[in-house]
Amino acid sequence: MFPKSMSIAEFDPEIKAAIEAEEVRQEEHIELIASENYASPRVMEAQGSVLTNKYAEGYPGKRYYGGCENVDVVEQLAIDRACELFGADWANVQPHSGSQANGAVYMAMLKAGDTVLGMSLDAGGHLTHGAKPNFSGKTYNAVQYGLDNETGLIDYDQVASLAREHKPKMIVAGFSAYSQIVDWQRFRDIADEVGAILLVDMAHVAGLVAAGVYPSPVGIADITTTTTHKTLGGPRGGLIMGKASEEIQKKINSAVFPGGQGGPLEHVIAAKAICFKEAMQDDFKGYQQQVVKNAQAMAGVFIERGFDVVSNGTENHLFLLSLIKQDITGKDADAALGRANITVNKNAVPNDPRSPFVTSGLRIGSPSITRRGFDEADAKALAGWICDILENMGDEGVIEQVKGKVKEICARLPVYER
């Protein structure tokens, strides 16, 4: 029915052209968006496999459809590997995204109107940690904690004070733009004091945690969620894990299916299983160590050049660059760097006077550049080029000079060998 010779190029040249253009963009641009990474050809092969054809509502051994014997093997491998990799007692690999993983936890553990304590968006939290436009801020009574104005670090005293005042049913720890080590045990102690459930969203640092480069929350939190891309470098998807608790596991599984999703994406789950196996290889720890070294090298250059790095450095894969002092908007900086083939994302910074669509900062991450082979010297050079552009906003000559250097280093360090 489907000959092997069938191709996208012949049938849909418009889509093929867009794919090829994106391949060129990824090869010729430097990727500094902290939530992005490059998936291996093995991961992409799984996502393009015949597993995409199979509907498999339910869980391994307990499906609502027949013919699931092979996808049962795939999903169980993913579950077992996730538990082994992170030291969890149970895992649900079906969430389609990190946001849906978090949504399932909310649905499983809370009722509408319950109080949730999470990090505010402008302090580095995620939409699903109680932001007003998100379901977590609309369905639940969201109380937000932030950073210490002097240190740029999480204000644990504020967290404890808010917890005592508002008695949240659940406390959410984790972030999308925080560059330091989180004291998971401090959150545990606060949660225990007020009788709250502790959810940790480690989406950004899961790869670092898997490699032992960043402290693990899995044995501390009641429930841990993550994505499988970002620092893990796998397919786009979500994962929920926890300590031994049959009650919590059952609630979570029911909230994922049938509560929030129907059929799982078994081709993506296969890719997750491969990603977990990749993270168990000897070279993965070296990669994650280099991710941190490269982020620290870049942050150091910005500080030396007089830019403000929130919390004055980084202990993970990302950092926030505040441009308030330079009176440059994140939107303008993002656009200028984009013209030099450097991809970043504008980001709100603590006490940002500008709107979330404009912002006064940039979020910079090192997973992608490290994946393609950047070392500290390359990272420092790159940070210097970014400084050159930011110090000469509007100078297209500087942008063109940097763009040439970017293309040279990208050619030297390709993402996918041809």
Swiss-Prot record:
Using the record's annotations, give every residue carrying the modification N6-(pyridoxal phosphate)lysine.
Answer: K230
Protein name, entry field: Serine hydroxymethyltransferase
Q: What is its EC number?
A: 2.1.2.1
Which residues does the annotation say bind (6S)-5,6,7,8-tetrahydrofolate? L121, G125, H126, L127, S355, P356, F357
Source species, domain of life: Bacteria
Classification from the root reads: Bacteria, Pseudomonadati, Pseudomonadota, Gammaproteobacteria, Oceanospirillales
Role summary: Catalyzes the reversible interconversion of serine and glycine with tetrahydrofolate (THF) serving as the one-carbon carrier. This reaction serves as the major source of one-carbon groups required for the biosynthesis of purines, thymidylate, methionine, and other important biomolecules. Also exhibits THF-independent aldolase activity toward beta-hydroxyamino acids, producing glycine and aldehydes, via a retro-aldol mechanism.
Which Gene Ontology CC terms are recorded? cytosol
Query: From what organism does this protein derive?
Result: Alcanivorax borkumensis (strain ATCC 700651 / DSM 11573 / NCIMB 13689 / SK2)
On subunit structure and binding partners, the annotation says: Homodimer.
